[in-house]
Each structure stands twice: as C-alpha cells, then as structure tokens.
Regions:
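Charged, terminal alpha-helix-loop-beta segments
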Residues: 1-137
Length: 137
C-alpha cells in the first residue's frame, strides 16, 4: 500500500463500480460506497481511497526499522475517500451508521488535510452511510 492511498481515475470508474469491496473497507461499508459512487461518480475526476493525513505517533526507537515505519503509518489518520473534481477536493467519510462521532471525525480530517495542503481549495465534506438518527442529520 502506498502512503498516498489507492488512486482511481475517471478511466477506472466502470471497474470501480463493479467491485465487491473497496480498499481497507468492510463489506458493509463497501456497499455504502458502491451505492454512493453509482449515484455520484460523474461529479468527480478521481477517487483516492485511504488517504493518510497527520503525523501519527512517535515510534519506539528500540523497535526494528520496519516496525517503526508501520507504527507511524498505521497511526496516521485515514480519510476514507479523497475525491477530486479538477482542483477541488472532497473528503468522504464512510460509515454504516452516521453518528455525531462521524461528523467530528471528518472535521478532524479537514483540519489535517488543510494543514498538509495549505494551497488547496477548501474541501467539501461528505459523510455517507446507510442510516442515522434525526438528531445527527
């Protein structure tokens, strides 16, 4: 897995829609993604799944070098989908059930994304899921 995620472009959309699962997603979350892509893929030029942002935790210097790299990689925050439409980014968080925690999570990702990409457009934020409750929506 590359540090910058799994990139799919407009040329990959047909293949992407036919997938049973998506990188680093559960079967249920993959179903949510598939339904969203079927309805919205024409709005975007690209999708990057599992885009890592943030610094991660400091690794133990006594561990093997590979373990240290994995510690940093695994502890960085993961934007489920970074979608692009020209230069405009959209951060997409995928949940089976959308909760207030999901909304806070995407705000954290926005902050980290802006910190790492200060020249980027202000990202649109989207949280997708199968269901939620009236207080969250």
């Amino acid at each position: 897995m590359r540090d910058d995620g799994y990139l799919f472009t407009r040329d990959d959309f047909v293949q992407m829609l036919a997938r049973k699962w998506y990188p680093e997603r559960t079967d249920r979350e993959s179903g949510v993604i598939r339904d969203y892509l079927a309805a919205h893929h024409v709005e975007f030029d690209s999708f990057t799944f599992s885009k890592r942002v943030g610094r991660g935790i400091e690794p133990n210097p006594e561990h093997l070098e590979g373990v240290q790299r994995n510690t940093v990689f695994s502890s960085r925050k993961r934007i489920d989908i970074l979608a692009g439409s020209g230069a405009h980014p959209t951060l997409i968080e995928v949940k089976e059930r959308v909760t207030p925690a999901s909304l806070g999570q995407i705000l954290t990702y926005r902050s980290l994304f802006i910190e790492e990409n200060p020249d980027a457009d202000e990202p649109s934020l989207v949280v997708i899921g199968r269901d939620s409750d009236p207080d969250t929506l």
